[in-house]
């Protein structure tokens, strides 16, 4: 069977694809945000099959990196239970009215299939999750036809795709590398009813023109025993059914030709007879009705066998290594968004075990901000192959300055940092949900890993900590990392050839304080991310200083995550955690106590 990684692994570089190939995976579903250029680079530089998301709903966030559904809707989008907060109204720096800045149109790459084939794409993915069977039939039929005939869609086929489901049309913006407001849309209230189209799809199941499954039939008719019919397909399924005991012929005996003719009548089913073997003893008789019933029973049994859930194979599970658990209280670590959040008072007060600084901020440093903690560079959550030379240069600069650790949030980071003599620590983007994840990362030579903030306290406690574990205990939790810049979509800014933002009218707001406002008035800070992307933060900071539970979970590190805080506020938070001070102001306990579906 094929071992492949879904798009929830957030793989978008050839280095990430090679990393999973080394682990035995044979196919990777790359991120939906990948452009044609990105896809070609991955196809040319990795040894595994590449699958591209070609048709269906687009998540606003990089798949596998969304905390919005869990923290706001109580359902984990990272584990397939998305509550679809993207489809709700929001305002950017304004009250939420009838704007939908997170609602992307569905992707449609039907006109790009030949281009994909030429660059080496092995498979296209068509989304059918939570859709009607008729929708799946319409979409699959058109894409299969285009692939078989090696062409693009006609105007009528495009109209059928849109009628089946769309949100004010489709987009191929990611594929073309063209982001912006044109990629967004909602399902209009007056959308055409696909009733007739879906009815036609239902009727098509009954037509002979549908692709059928070739089967081999073997029938035996002998005196004194029930007749038998065995039907086999080319996928290894085989069934045998029995019929009545044949009678002695009174007038005309059954012969092999008549028996074969009866068995070959598979019309109206999903099967066609490819080969038929009939063995009939002389002087016997079976009625036409009995033979027809025998054939129907056999084909029905084969259909059930093909639809049955495959037998779950028991694979050997290697034992976990010894746990690296500690009974001591976790040591504090600190992550900042900007260098301005660091101050001598902060470093002296908390004496953190580690300080995490975005790699982009390293270029602003002339020397380490202080002594005592271990200084760690945080790699961008999202980047592309073309960015890696610049990132490698920044990593070398960080090493020369005295940084000794790197925070890894994606498997594609690993080939980027190898050979630079850094200690490797896992970030929350790796989605550590269980002990096996920790063991896997230990095999990758990581020395610690931050567990998912979707876990409950009890689940974190029960982890077999074969690797030193860290958890976020303070800060605005990241809700989304988006390829589209939400502020740019509102202001009309554009990017120049150097990737710098050029405002259309007035000063650029992309790097200024911006918020996303929901229907309740909650404001979610929008922070700029590497590559002119956007990271949406929760409206309330997580606060656990007064909850002793997080100190009794076997964690080695507890992270204070600073995003929008001033330098003074950072110092105050550290002091609160040292004093186990009670909560004040607007805050959240996250999912550590209430959990998530």
Write out the residue ranges for each language-model feature.
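Surface-exposed amphipathic alpha-helical tracts and adjacent flexible/coil segments at the periphery
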Residues: 1-5, 14-428, 432-597
């Amino acid at each position: 069977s094929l071992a492949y990684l879904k798009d929830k692994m957030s793989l978008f570089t050839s280095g990430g694809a090679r990393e999973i190939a080394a682990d035995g995976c044979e196919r990777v579903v790359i991120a939906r945000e990948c452009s044609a250029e990105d896809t070609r680079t991955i196809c040319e530089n990795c040894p595994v099959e590449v699958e591209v998301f070609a048709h269906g709903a687009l998540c606003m966030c990089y798949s596998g990196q969304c905390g919005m559904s869990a923290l706001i809707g109580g359902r984990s989008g990272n584990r397939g239970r998305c509550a679809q907060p993207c489809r709700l109204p929001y305002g950017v720096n304004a009250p939420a009215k009838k704007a939908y800045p997170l609602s992307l149109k569905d992707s449609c790459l039907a006109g790009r299939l030949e281009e994909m084939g030429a660059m080496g794409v092995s498979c296209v993915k068509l989304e059918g999750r939570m859709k009607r069977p008729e929708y799946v039939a319409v979409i699959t039929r058109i894409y299969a036809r285009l692939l078989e005939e090696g062409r693009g869609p006609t105007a009528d086929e495009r109209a059928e795709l849109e009628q089946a489901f769309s949100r004010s049309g489709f987009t191929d913006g990611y594929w073309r590398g063209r982001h912006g407001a044109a990629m967004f849309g909602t399902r209009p209230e007056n959308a055409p009813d696909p009733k007739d189209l879906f009815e036609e799809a239902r009727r098509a199941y009954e037509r002979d023109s549908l692709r059928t499954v070739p089967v081999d039939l073997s029938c035996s008719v002998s005196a004194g025993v029930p007749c038998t019919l065995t039907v086999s397909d080319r996928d290894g399924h085989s069934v045998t059914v029995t019929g009545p005991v044949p009678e002695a012929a009174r007038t005309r005996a059954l012969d092999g030709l008549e028996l074969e003719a009866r068995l070959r009548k598979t019309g109206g089913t999903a099967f066609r007879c490819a080969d038929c073997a009939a063995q009939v003893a002389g002087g016997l008789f079976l009625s036409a009705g009995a033979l027809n019933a025998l054939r129907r029973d056999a084909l029905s049994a084969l259909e059930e066998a093909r639809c049955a859930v495959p037998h779950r194979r028991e694979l050997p599970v290697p034992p976990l290594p010894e746990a690296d658990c500690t009974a001591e209280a976790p040591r504090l670590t600190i992550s900042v968004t900007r260098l301005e959040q660091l101050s001598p008072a902060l470093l002296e007060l908390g004496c953190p075990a580690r300080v995490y600084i975005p790699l982009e901020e390293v270029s602003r440093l002339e020397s380490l901000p202080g002594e005592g903690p271990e200084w760690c560079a945080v790699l961008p959550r999202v980047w592309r192959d073309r960015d890696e030379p610049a990132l490698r240069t920044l990593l070398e600069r960080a090493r020369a300055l005295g940084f000794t650790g790197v925070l890894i949030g994606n498997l594609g980071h690993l080939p980027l940092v190898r050979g630079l003599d850094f200690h490797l620590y896992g970030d929350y983007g790796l989605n550590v949900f269980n002990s096996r994840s920790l063991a896997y990362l230990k095999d990758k030579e990581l020395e610690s890993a931050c567990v998912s903030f979707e876990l409950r306290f009890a689940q974190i406690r029960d982890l077999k900590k074969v690797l030193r574990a860290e958890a976020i205990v303070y800060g605005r939790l990241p809700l989304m990392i988006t390829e589209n810049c939400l502020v740019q979509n509102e202001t009309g800014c554009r990017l120049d050839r150097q990737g710098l933002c050029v405002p259309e009218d007035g000063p650029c707001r992309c790097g200024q304080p911006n918020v996303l406002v929901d229907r309740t008035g909650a404001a979610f800070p929008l922070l700029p991310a590497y590559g002119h992307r956007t990271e949406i933060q929760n409206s309330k900071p997580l606060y656990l200083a007064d909850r002793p539970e997080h100190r009794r979970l076997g964690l080695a590190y507890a992270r204070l995550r600073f995003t929008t805080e001033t330098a003074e506020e950072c110092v105050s938070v550290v002091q609160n955690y040292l004093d186990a001070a009670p909560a004040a102001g607007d805050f959240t306990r996250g999912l550590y106590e209430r959990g998530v579906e």
